[in-house]
A protein has these predicted regions:
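Catalytic domains of carbohydrate-active enzymes that cleave complex glycans
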Residues: 2-175
Length: 175
């Protein structure tokens, strides 16, 4: 998208996004577009109701990762969208392509899954939570997500490891 706009700044951004979504997410594209629209609407709501603008960086991301910005019903709606995306992926006939697209969608699902675990673990019984944590940890490792945030004060110290966080969540369950 950025490369296209560097070559021609007059291109229609929404058209480029649509084209990217169709090629990258294939049959799941409408659902990932719905997800992107929902995320953008949430950021807009945060800006309008709280005057809060999203910025990159560890300090900003830690301040944003709160239930007031990501209500449970919002995250649940996102997970429903991902369920529809996974169902659509099954329509892809070519197995290799289906697996590639599934992995792309799984990668996109990691952030809302993390937020559900971190902000709303008390909504689930121990068995559900254990399964969610173990699936999240396994998927994160398989998809190459090792850390859930940066630490700009000491980038060589990886205290924000997914494995450490998952172990912390599991310890909170007991057993």
């Amino acid at each position: 998208l950025h490369a296209e706009l560097l070559w021609d700044a007059d291109l229609d951004v929404n058209e480029l996004i649509d084209e990217f979504m169709e090629h990258y997410f294939k049959e799941a594209a409408p659902y990932l577009q719905e997800y992107l629209d929902l995320v953008n609407a949430n950021y807009k709501l945060m800006e309008q109701t709280r005057g809060y603008l999203a910025y990159a960086g560890s300090d900003e991301s830690s301040r944003m990762a709160r239930a007031e910005f990501y209500p449970k019903r919002y995250l649940s709606r996102i997970m429903e969208i991902f369920d529809k995306a996974y169902a659509a992926i099954e329509q892809i006939e070519d197995e290799d392509e289906r697996n590639i697209v599934r992995e792309r969608v799984e990668t996109e699902s990691l952030s809302p899954r993390f937020m559900l675990l971190d902000l709303y673990s008390y909504y689930y019984n121990d068995s559900q939570l254990r399964t969610m944590i173990e699936e999240f940890r396994d998927d994160s490792a398989r998809l190459g997500l090792l850390h859930y945030r940066e630490d700009v004060s000491n980038p060589s110290e990886y205290k924000y490891s997914i494995n450490i966080k998952a172990d912390e969540w599991l310890r909170s369950l007991g057993n």
